Amino acid sequence: MFFAVDAAIGGGISIADETADGNLMVKPFKLALAQSPGELAGPRARVDWLAATLSGIAKQKADLLVLPEMFLSGYYIGDAVHDRAEAADGPFAREIAALAARFGIAVLYGFAERADGLIYSAAQCFGPDGARLGGHRKLAIPPGFETGTYTAGAGCRLFELGGVKIAILICYDSEFTEPMRHVAGLGAELVAVPTALSAEWDWVARTMLPTRAYENGLFLAYANHAGHENGLDYLGASFIAAPDGRELARAGSGPEVLLAEIDPARVAAARARLPYLKDRKGLKLDAG
């Protein structure tokens, strides 16, 4: 095994194997998504659950595990969020970073971030060496209990893992066309969407978000909770979608781990076949 440059993914460095005939075979990027139980208690129980889950998927050689919105703290927890919020480098964050390094799997998870006296609905990713690769603060705060509790974030950034360019959007962010289109324009090939979607919003997970993958020509990992939390019924229905909008994996309503191999070359192929991102620039929207 050795390192080779893969032109199909924009010159990024990928681990490649040599086949019997001497050709290069790029190591596939294996994506895991965990639909975690909503009934889990506080951060301690959730980190313990994560450790057990990572132990299981390590056997599958996963490169990245995506977890739901507010995985660490719990989502529908009322005023308890003030006690469970922590800094991006807080004690539980350090434990999660250590787990990522222990199992050699990048971990992307949602949490309540405390910074400068404010609380954000945030997500961050630790790489397989435990180093922080990137993070995101929820841009759009929906009506309801989140308003007045969380401060809206600003900006979207990409990070790279295994030759794949990754962006994070959180739940409601992804329901607007603009953020998804923005990160696609930045070059995102995979968008991770930690979410906390209740059962009444079924069509968002089954129709709207696969369409976001299709219209932007990218992979999309939508990670929801399962079961119940303090009277809130989660939909489940987490999924991984390809750049053509097709489902690579779809969860039911209970706790589940999804696995899919993603090939960034499919992003370029999808965007060439239906060049929405390029052709939209020529649209004349003003009448004058």
Please give the residue ranges for each predicted region.
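Short beta-strand scaffold segments in enzyme catalytic cores
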Residues: 109-111, 122-125, 157, 238-240, ...
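Active-site catalytic loop in hydrolytic enzyme cores
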Residues: 88, 114-189, 198-207, 269, ...
